[in-house]
A protein has these predicted regions:
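N-terminal module-boundary/linker segments of secreted carbohydrate-active enzymes
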Residues: 1-56
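Domain-level detector of nuclease and nuclease-like folds
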Residues: 57-189
Length: 189
């Protein structure tokens, strides 16, 4: 494979070249149909939601949003770039959790302050010192889902390394490393 023997920036660029000709989701409005294949627990009709422990069932999408886990505002909010409808970072999300998460970077929430939002899975609040990349608030996912976010963020940083990042809370325009060290530490916990 074109990825064998590659590491760091060379691996990231090889992934970028490999995935550039991917099949796109037909439209943003069609995402719930795709989510029924990618984000429903096996042997049940329960939505897989990395943002909330509220149980909602497919095929109804009532109470859910289409969440850009890698916030679209980070690349300027364009709806014409392939990242906007890339299923590799779009997830069903309970509405209140999605609204609270906003476009905040992932980070560890400072527990010495009251959280702005906490639902048992997602926490939004002030970042611990050294995290957040200058953002006032951060979104901390549950430990159960940090690996999912790590894969998602690595994919997005690799597949879209040609995008100009408007917000660089977690990512830099550098070829390597792309994710800031504090965000890597969080995602590996």
């Amino acid at each position: 494979s074109s990825l064998n023997g590659k590491a760091d920036g060379n691996l990231k660029t090889a992934i970028f070249k490999l995935v550039r000709n991917f099949t796109q989701v037909s439209s943003y409005s069609a995402l719930p149909q795709y989510f029924q294949k990618t984000d429903v627990y096996p042997n049940s009709s329960r939505w897989w939601d990395m943002y909330s422990d509220i149980v909602l069932y497919a095929p109804s999408f009532k109470g859910l949003n289409r969440e850009h886990s890698f916030p679209k505002s980070w690349w300027g909010g364009s709806t014409t770039v392939p990242a906007y409808v890339d299923l590799n970072h779009l997830y069903p999300s309970e509405m209140a959790a999605n609204t609270a998460k906003s476009n905040y970077p992932l980070g560890m929430v400072d527990r010495s302050y009251n959280a702005n939002f906490q639902n048992g899975i997602s926490t939004v609040g002030y970042p611990v010192s050294g995290q957040g990349g200058g953002a006032k608030y951060v979104f901390e996912p549950d430990d159960e889902f940090k690996g999912d976010f790590a894969r998602t963020y690595f994919y997005m940083a690799s597949a879209y390394q040609d995008l100009t990042w408007k917000y660089t809370y977690m990512v830099s325009q550098n070829l390597w490393p792309t994710l800031n060290s504090w965000s890597v530490d969080l995602l590996l916990k």
